[in-house]
Amino acid sequence: MRATVLGAGSWGTALASLLAGKGYTVTSWDKDAAVLDDIARNHRNERYLPGLQLPPTLHASGEVAKALEGAELVVLAVPSHAVRPVVIEAKRHVHAGTPIVCVAKGIELDTLMTMTEVVEDVLPVPLHPYLAVLSGPSFAKEVAKGLPTAVTVAARWERIAKQVQDAFHTKTFRPYTSGDVVGCEVGGCVKNVVAIAAGISDGMGFGANAMAALVTRGLAEITRLAVRKGANPLTLSGLAGLGDLVLTCSSDLSRNRTVGRGLAAGKTADAIQRELGQVAEGVRNARSARELAKRLGVDMPITEAIYRVLYEGLAPREAVTALMMRETKPEL
């Protein structure tokens, strides 16, 4: 099989490495020439996955047309804000019958579309049925190291979900299939906002009780939004919902949790992301998820609080107080 991964960041490189490790011929594309040169010459990506050797069947190209030539599987692994321009550039070189796996997590700010909705907005209608989402508790570094991981692959066509599942399945990477694209996407992007809240809680020393409450109530508001968009609520109890949320809220590898800890220490989100050297999607998604919730009439108090901390200068401690002092209500 020939596969193309658009995006050579940590997640794109980890998935490209996984596919190449199965013996597939894989080409990574990116706009960062230095990263591509490192992959091509040294079979490494020291910027995003330092110290890890990449398979020799992983190649690199900075030309979209060349990278997609003969591709039987396309993985879209760019940051959420880059999905639309990259798909616009790539669409002439992708053909019907080729599965397109979107692993970007986000809600586009201007349109409030999920990533697959953005892709469908750009691609010709005959390509829409071949679109799939891969999401779940999966840090790139651990996947690249071959540590056991389970994820969800969602597609509207069961045949496409199964095809993508088979392409990615290894002895250390286990995909489950689903038909709930919306649920997987909403779970995958809004959990990053809740993870910022978890980082704030941890950074301010609020303890295990607060963390458990944040994860539980965070899942509740994620589920409300997903269901309003047509998702199956059970999806949010699975890998692409609860699984991804728990991982992102609890691990030091989480960039979004790191942002929250930095905010608790008095840093700005911009300064924290410069230190990280990578995108923390929850910063953008706090704004777009809030706007989507307002449009759909969904109550999302944690998302609202994080938005106010990031964009209105609300002190983290005041945000916690505001959440705790909301009008009392039944849990369910």
Curated annotation (Swiss-Prot):
Which keywords does the record carry? Cytoplasm, Lipid biosynthesis, Lipid metabolism, NAD, NADP, Nucleotide-binding, Oxidoreductase, Phospholipid biosynthesis, Phospholipid metabolism
- Pathway membership, UniProt: Membrane lipid metabolism; glycerophospholipid metabolism
**Pfam families, per the entry:** NAD_Gly3P_dh_C (PF07479), NAD_Gly3P_dh_N (PF01210)
Catalytic activities: sn-glycerol 3-phosphate + NAD(+) = dihydroxyacetone phosphate + NADH + H(+); sn-glycerol 3-phosphate + NADP(+) = dihydroxyacetone phosphate + NADPH + H(+)
Q: Where does sn-glycerol 3-phosphate bind?
A: K105, G136, S138, K191, D244, S254, R255, N256
Compartmental location: Cytoplasm
Q: Which GO terms describe its cellular component?
A: cytosol
**Residues at the active site:** K191
Cite the GO molecular-function annotations of the record: glycerol-3-phosphate dehydrogenase [NAD(P)+] activity; NAD binding
Q: What class of enzyme is it?
A: oxidoreductase
InterPro entries of this UniProt entry? 6-PGluconate_DH-like_C_sf, 6PGD_dom2, G3P_DH_NAD-dep, G3P_DH_NAD-dep_C, G3P_DH_NAD-dep_N, NAD(P)-bd_dom_sf
Which domain of life does the protein's organism represent?
Bacteria
Specify which residues bind NADPH according to the UniProt entry for this protein. S10, W11, K31, K105, A140, R255, V279, E281
Family that this chain belongs to = Belongs to the NAD-dependent glycerol-3-phosphate dehydrogenase family.
PANTHER family reported for this sequence: GLYCEROL-3-PHOSPHATE DEHYDROGENASE (PTHR11728), GLYCEROL-3-PHOSPHATE DEHYDROGENASE [NAD(+)] 2, CHLOROPLASTIC (PTHR11728:SF1)
Q: What is the protein name stated in its UniProt record?
A: Glycerol-3-phosphate dehydrogenase [NAD(P)+]
Q: Which species does this protein come from?
A: Anaeromyxobacter sp. (strain K)
